[in-house]
């Protein structure tokens, strides 16, 4: 098995291939036809029409990476076991180690490794941790000009302007109302940071048989 540093270097090298849509891209399993973008987006939109967060999307799969999500306000986003989403200044907090899963080009789900909960946003723009992967847990990842990423709800947006609800953290680390957040605000700017497996070895035993 390749050393963890080699695995990290490999994943890091792949990230640069997708700057136009963020830091993720798709690799279909061997022997499968790559799903078309329209097919996946269509499935997500059909789920949204079934009611807010009502459709499970556990069948969607793609590239999985582990990262910390650092906000320009100075906090790492973390998902607690009780479903609370908040910021922490602690580097390599167990609840701040997140799995990024590409479900379509430019669309990702974010799951807390330790809590096992997916990042979700409801129709009020509130962030929460979800036990199931639903349409409320799919976000549009956009690579911005300032080298930060933004994450906006794939299903919720303002009807009058079309502006989407954004994942955001306030200056005190509390989650910011996604309906009031905008792309140009630093509350919405996030930087995916690499995870050092040696800092959180308990989270890597099952994934890479790391001991």
UniProtKB/Swiss-Prot annotation:
One Gene Ontology molecular-function label: fibroblast growth factor receptor binding
SUPFAM superfamilies given in the database record: Cytokine
InterPro entries, per database record: Fibroblast_GF_fam, IL1/FGF
Biological process, per Gene Ontology: cell differentiation; fibroblast growth factor receptor signaling pathway; inner ear auditory receptor cell differentiation; negative regulation of neuron apoptotic process; positive regulation of cell population proliferation; positive regulation of ERK1 and ERK2 cascade; regulation of cardiac muscle cell proliferation; regulation of neuron differentiation
Keyword Transcription applies: no
Keywords: Growth factor, Secreted
Taxonomic superkingdom: Eukaryota
Localization terms from the record: Secreted
GO cellular component, one term: extracellular region
Major localisation: secreted
PANTHER family (alphabetical): FIBROBLAST GROWTH FACTOR (PTHR11486)
Protein role: Neurotrophic factor that regulates central nervous development and function.
Family as reported in the entry's similarity comment: Belongs to the heparin-binding growth factors family.
Subunit structure and binding partners: Homodimer. Interacts with FGFR2 and FGFR4. Affinity between fibroblast growth factors (FGFs) and their receptors is increased by heparan sulfate glycosaminoglycans that function as coreceptors.
Name used for this protein in its record: Fibroblast growth factor 20
Gene name for this UniProt entry: Fgf20
């Amino acid at each position: 098995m390749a050393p963890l540093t080699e695995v990290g270097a490999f994943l890091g090298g792949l990230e640069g291939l997708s700057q136009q849509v963020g830091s993720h891209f798709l690799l279909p399993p061997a022997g499968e036809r790559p799903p078309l973008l329209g097919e996946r987006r269509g499935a997500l939109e059909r789920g949204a029409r079934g009611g807010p967060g009502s459709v499970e999307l556990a069948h969607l799969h793609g590239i999985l990476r582990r990262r910390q999500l650092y906000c320009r306000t100075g906090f790492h986003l973390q998902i607690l076991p009780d479903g609370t989403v908040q910021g922490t200044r602690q580097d390599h907090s167990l609840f701040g180690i997140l799995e990024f899963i590409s479900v379509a080009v430019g669309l990702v789900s974010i799951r807390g490794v330790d809590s096992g909960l997916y990042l979700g946003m409801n129709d009020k723009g509130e962030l929460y941790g979800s036990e199931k992967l639903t349409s409320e847990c799919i976000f549009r990842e956009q690579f911005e000009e300032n080298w930060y990423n933004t994450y906006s709800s794939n299903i919720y947006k303002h009807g009058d302007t079309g502006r989407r609800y954004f994942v955001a953290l306030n200056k005190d680390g509390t989650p910011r109302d996604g309906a009031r957040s905008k792309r140009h605000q630093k509350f919405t700017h996030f930087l995916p940071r690499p995870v050092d497996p040696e800092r959180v070895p308990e989270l890597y035993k099952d994934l890479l048989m790391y001991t």
